[in-house]
């Protein structure tokens, strides 16, 4: 089973809010998920609001889940991808 870390869209029209989730790559965008690991609000007042459970994200990355391009950028901004790369090089 190919697993991806990706965004599912919530919120109303022209006011998006996203959950960062782990899901089977074959399931629909807003379909069944395996686990929610964070949220992303691009329309918050000052700057985009990002909340990610770092331990869960690293667990899924180490288990082989592939992040989408957008989620990869979000995790990079949070410093999670850097920690993942360091863990991978240490092995």
Curated annotation (Swiss-Prot):
GO CC list: cytoplasm; small ribosomal subunit
Lineage: Bacteria, Bacillati, Bacillota, Bacilli, Bacillales
Organism of this sequence: Staphylococcus aureus (strain NCTC 8325 / PS 47)
UniProt-recorded name of the protein: Small ribosomal subunit protein bS16
Tagged with keyword Ribonucleoprotein: yes
GO molecular function: structural constituent of ribosome
Keywords of this entry: Ribonucleoprotein, Ribosomal protein
HAMAP family linked to this entry: Ribosomal_bS16 (MF_00385)
Family that this chain belongs to: Belongs to the bacterial ribosomal protein bS16 family.
GO BP, one annotated term: translation
């Amino acid at each position: 089973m190919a697993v991806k870390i990706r965004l599912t869209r919530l919120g109303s029209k022209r006011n998006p809010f996203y959950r960062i989730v782990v899901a089977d790559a074959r399931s629909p965008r807003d379909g069944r998920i395996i686990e929610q690991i964070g949220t992303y609000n691009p329309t918050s007042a000052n700057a985009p609001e990002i909340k990610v459970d770092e331990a869960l994200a690293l667990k899924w990355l180490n288990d082989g889940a592939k992040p989408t391009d957008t989620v990869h950028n979000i995790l990079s901004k949070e410093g999670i991808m850097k920690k993942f790369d360091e863990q991978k090089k240490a092995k």
